Regions:
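PLP-dependent amino-acid enzyme catalytic core
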Residues: 1-176
Length: 176
């Protein structure tokens, strides 16, 4: 196991039997303990794949910037991964998020752009603003700017097809 890199610790999380749910249903119910990932969530996998995809396609290079609109764990996962790859991270976040979440993101190196919390249908929605910010920054960046776009980025699902699904298959010896 490679222990020289925090991102090498993403994935291979335990599969644990959920005792009460199993007893109540009469079935064996399991859950992936994704809180064992460095960013403590399932979003670390997606963040890793999204960043690696952007790097592999030469959309960004070291010193480049990832931009994402997130109110949740994707931002923390991206912060962990971006730090490892020497990338900047700008998070567009609703100003209604907890101080603790915002402080965590800042301590992990993310620059926060706080915006009003408005419905997705509003052009000022944090996700739509993140796309616009990425487009504007990319016009003047020499190392590239990439909009992570977690909700529509197919790499997000690919992360789970290639890692989570395979882990579950192996951890259950194919008996699922």
């Amino acid at each position: 196991m490679d222990t020289n890199s925090i991102i090498s610790q993403i994935g291979n999380t335990p599969l644990v039997k959920l005792k009460q749910a199993s007893e109540l249903t009469g079935c064996n119910i399991y859950g992936k303990a994704e809180y064992f990932n460095p960013g403590e969530s399932v979003k670390d996998r997606a963040a890793l794949f999204i960043v690696q995809d952007a790097l592999n396609r030469n959309l960004i290079s070291k010193g480049g910037t990832i931009v994402e609109g997130t109110a949740g764990n994707t931002g923390i996962g991206l912060a962990v991964v971006c730090k490892e790859y020497g990338l900047k991270l700008k998070i567009v976040i609703p100003n209604t998020q907890s101080i603790e979440k915002k402080e965590t993101l800042k301590k992990l190196g993310a620059e926060l752009i706080e915006v009003d919390a408005v419905p997705y249908s509003n052009p000022k929605n944090y996700i739509k603003q993140s796309k616009k910010i990425a487009e504007d920054l990319n016009k003047k960046s020499k190392n590239g700017v990439y909009w992570a776009n977690q909700f529509d980025n197919l790499i997000n699902a690919e992360a789970h097809i290639k890692t989570t699904a395979e882990e579950i298959w192996n951890q259950t010896a194919g008996l699922i």
